[in-house]
Protein backbone atom coordinates (compact mmCIF):
# COMPACT_ATOMS: atom_id res chain seq x y z
CA UNK A 1 0.00 0.00 0.00
CA UNK A 2 1.47 3.33 -1.10
CA UNK A 3 1.32 6.34 1.23
CA UNK A 4 -0.47 9.40 -0.11
CA UNK A 5 1.72 12.31 -1.09
CA UNK A 6 1.24 15.24 1.23
CA UNK A 7 -0.03 18.36 -0.46
CA UNK A 8 0.37 21.85 0.93
CA UNK A 9 -3.00 23.58 1.06
CA UNK A 10 -3.12 27.30 0.33
CA UNK A 11 -5.07 29.00 3.11
CA UNK A 12 -7.05 32.21 2.92
CA UNK A 13 -4.42 33.86 5.13
CA UNK A 14 -2.09 33.70 2.12
CA UNK A 15 -4.54 34.98 -0.51
CA UNK A 16 -4.53 38.74 -1.10
CA UNK A 17 -5.61 41.03 -3.90
CA UNK A 18 -3.83 44.34 -4.36
CA UNK A 19 -0.19 45.30 -3.94
CA UNK A 20 1.49 42.77 -1.60
CA UNK A 21 3.71 45.58 -0.25
CA UNK A 22 0.80 47.97 0.36
CA UNK A 23 0.97 49.78 3.71
CA UNK A 24 -2.70 49.11 4.51
CA UNK A 25 -4.38 45.73 4.80
CA UNK A 26 -8.16 45.50 4.69
CA UNK A 27 -9.37 42.15 5.99
CA UNK A 28 -12.99 41.05 5.86
CA UNK A 29 -14.70 38.16 7.58
CA UNK A 30 -17.67 37.20 5.45
CA UNK A 31 -20.25 34.67 4.30
CA UNK A 32 -21.06 33.95 0.65
CA UNK A 33 -24.83 33.71 1.27
CA UNK A 34 -25.02 37.05 3.08
CA UNK A 35 -26.73 39.86 1.18
CA UNK A 36 -24.81 42.41 3.25
CA UNK A 37 -21.48 40.77 2.34
CA UNK A 38 -22.43 40.71 -1.34
CA UNK A 39 -23.25 44.43 -1.26
CA UNK A 40 -20.06 45.33 0.58
CA UNK A 41 -18.04 43.25 -1.92
CA UNK A 42 -18.86 45.96 -4.48
CA UNK A 43 -17.60 48.58 -2.01
CA UNK A 44 -14.34 46.66 -1.58
CA UNK A 45 -13.85 46.52 -5.37
CA UNK A 46 -14.18 50.34 -5.52
CA UNK A 47 -11.78 50.80 -2.61
CA UNK A 48 -9.17 48.60 -4.30
CA UNK A 49 -9.36 50.82 -7.39
CA UNK A 50 -9.21 54.06 -5.41
CA UNK A 51 -6.30 52.96 -3.22
CA UNK A 52 -4.39 51.03 -5.87
CA UNK A 53 -0.84 50.40 -4.67
CA UNK A 54 -1.72 51.44 -1.11
CA UNK A 55 -4.23 48.74 -0.15
CA UNK A 56 -4.29 44.97 -0.12
CA UNK A 57 -7.42 42.96 0.68
CA UNK A 58 -7.80 39.60 2.39
CA UNK A 59 -11.14 37.77 2.63
CA UNK A 60 -11.62 35.35 5.50
CA UNK A 61 -14.47 32.90 5.97
CA UNK A 62 -17.09 33.30 8.67
CA UNK A 63 -20.03 31.17 7.49
CA UNK A 64 -23.21 31.75 9.49
CA UNK A 65 -24.26 28.12 9.20
CA UNK A 66 -27.33 28.47 11.42
CA UNK A 67 -29.01 30.69 8.85
CA UNK A 68 -27.07 29.92 5.65
CA UNK A 69 -27.06 26.20 4.87
CA UNK A 70 -24.70 26.47 1.88
CA UNK A 71 -22.21 29.00 3.29
CA UNK A 72 -19.75 26.39 4.57
CA UNK A 73 -19.51 24.49 1.27
CA UNK A 74 -19.28 27.76 -0.67
CA UNK A 75 -16.31 28.76 1.50
CA UNK A 76 -14.72 25.36 0.90
CA UNK A 77 -15.30 25.77 -2.84
CA UNK A 78 -13.43 29.09 -2.82
CA UNK A 79 -10.50 27.35 -1.12
CA UNK A 80 -10.62 24.56 -3.69
CA UNK A 81 -10.36 27.22 -6.40
CA UNK A 82 -7.53 28.92 -4.48
CA UNK A 83 -5.41 25.79 -4.89
CA UNK A 84 -5.30 26.61 -8.61
CA UNK A 85 -4.89 30.37 -8.21
CA UNK A 86 -8.58 31.02 -8.89
CA UNK A 87 -9.73 32.24 -5.46
CA UNK A 88 -10.76 35.74 -6.56
CA UNK A 89 -12.57 34.53 -9.66
CA UNK A 90 -14.53 32.06 -7.51
CA UNK A 91 -15.05 34.68 -4.79
CA UNK A 92 -16.77 37.01 -7.26
CA UNK A 93 -18.75 34.14 -8.80
CA UNK A 94 -20.06 32.98 -5.41
CA UNK A 95 -21.32 36.44 -4.50
CA UNK A 96 -22.90 36.83 -7.93
CA UNK A 97 -24.76 33.53 -7.48
CA UNK A 98 -25.30 33.62 -3.71
CA UNK A 99 -28.82 32.19 -3.99
CA UNK A 100 -27.64 29.05 -5.85
CA UNK A 101 -24.79 27.50 -3.89
CA UNK A 102 -25.54 23.76 -3.96
CA UNK A 103 -22.66 21.35 -4.57
CA UNK A 104 -23.46 20.79 -8.25
CA UNK A 105 -23.71 24.55 -8.86
CA UNK A 106 -20.41 25.07 -7.04
CA UNK A 107 -18.73 22.56 -9.35
CA UNK A 108 -20.10 24.40 -12.40
CA UNK A 109 -18.94 27.78 -11.06
CA UNK A 110 -15.48 26.31 -10.49
CA UNK A 111 -15.35 25.12 -14.11
CA UNK A 112 -16.49 28.56 -15.28
CA UNK A 113 -13.63 30.09 -13.26
CA UNK A 114 -11.07 27.82 -14.90
CA UNK A 115 -10.62 25.25 -12.12
CA UNK A 116 -9.53 21.96 -13.69
CA UNK A 117 -9.38 19.67 -10.63
CA UNK A 118 -11.42 16.60 -11.57
CA UNK A 119 -11.88 15.83 -7.86
CA UNK A 120 -13.38 19.24 -7.05
CA UNK A 121 -16.83 17.82 -6.18
CA UNK A 122 -15.25 14.93 -4.28
CA UNK A 123 -13.17 17.43 -2.28
CA UNK A 124 -16.38 19.30 -1.40
CA UNK A 125 -18.19 16.13 -0.35
CA UNK A 126 -15.19 15.05 1.76
CA UNK A 127 -14.77 18.53 3.32
CA UNK A 128 -11.12 18.59 2.26
CA UNK A 129 -10.92 22.32 3.03
CA UNK A 130 -13.42 22.37 5.90
CA UNK A 131 -10.74 22.60 8.57
CA UNK A 132 -9.35 25.70 6.86
CA UNK A 133 -12.76 27.39 6.91
CA UNK A 134 -13.15 26.46 10.58
CA UNK A 135 -9.72 27.94 11.26
CA UNK A 136 -10.89 31.27 9.79
CA UNK A 137 -14.10 31.06 11.81
CA UNK A 138 -12.22 30.44 15.07
CA UNK A 139 -9.79 33.27 14.35
CA UNK A 140 -12.74 35.57 13.69
CA UNK A 141 -14.34 34.60 17.00
CA UNK A 142 -11.01 35.22 18.78
CA UNK A 143 -10.91 38.70 17.20
CA UNK A 144 -14.44 39.46 18.39
CA UNK A 145 -16.36 38.83 15.15
CA UNK A 146 -19.98 37.92 15.83
CA UNK A 147 -21.68 38.90 12.57
CA UNK A 148 -20.77 39.62 8.98
CA UNK A 149 -19.49 41.58 7.27
CA UNK A 150 -16.74 42.40 9.77
CA UNK A 151 -13.69 44.42 8.73
CA UNK A 152 -10.23 44.99 10.12
CA UNK A 153 -7.90 47.73 8.91
CA UNK A 154 -4.27 46.85 9.68
CA UNK A 155 -5.57 44.29 12.20
CA UNK A 156 -7.74 46.86 14.04
CA UNK A 157 -11.47 46.15 14.18
CA UNK A 158 -13.41 48.64 12.06
CA UNK A 159 -16.48 49.57 14.10
CA UNK A 160 -18.39 51.82 11.70
CA UNK A 161 -20.99 50.86 9.13
CA UNK A 162 -19.03 49.39 6.18
CA UNK A 163 -19.98 51.97 3.57
CA UNK A 164 -17.58 53.23 0.91
CA UNK A 165 -17.15 56.58 2.69
CA UNK A 166 -16.65 55.09 6.16
CA UNK A 167 -14.14 52.47 5.00
CA UNK A 168 -12.36 55.09 2.90
CA UNK A 169 -11.95 57.29 6.00
CA UNK A 170 -10.59 54.33 7.95
CA UNK A 171 -8.11 53.50 5.20
CA UNK A 172 -7.02 57.15 4.89
CA UNK A 173 -6.45 57.28 8.66
CA UNK A 174 -4.33 54.12 8.45
CA UNK A 175 -2.31 55.67 5.60
CA UNK A 176 -1.69 58.83 7.66
CA UNK A 177 -0.61 56.71 10.61
CA UNK A 178 1.75 54.75 8.35
CA UNK A 179 3.33 58.01 7.08
CA UNK A 180 3.80 59.28 10.65
CA UNK A 181 5.54 56.05 11.63
CA UNK A 182 7.79 56.26 8.58
CA UNK A 183 8.95 59.87 9.13
CA UNK A 184 10.95 59.39 12.35
CA UNK A 185 12.89 56.51 10.78
CA UNK A 186 13.88 58.63 7.78
CA UNK A 187 14.88 61.59 10.02
CA UNK A 188 17.09 59.32 12.12
CA UNK A 189 19.18 58.51 9.04
CA UNK A 190 19.78 62.20 8.19
Predicted regions and their residues:
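Structural alpha/beta surface segment adjacent to cysteine/selenocysteine redox centers
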Residues: 27-28, 32-112, 116, 172, ...
Amino acid sequence: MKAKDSVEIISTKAVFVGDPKAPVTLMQFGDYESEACAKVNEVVEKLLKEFQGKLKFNFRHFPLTRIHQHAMKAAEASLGAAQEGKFWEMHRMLFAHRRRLGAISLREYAKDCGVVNKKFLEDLVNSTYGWQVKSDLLEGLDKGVRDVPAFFINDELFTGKPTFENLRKGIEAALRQHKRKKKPASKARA
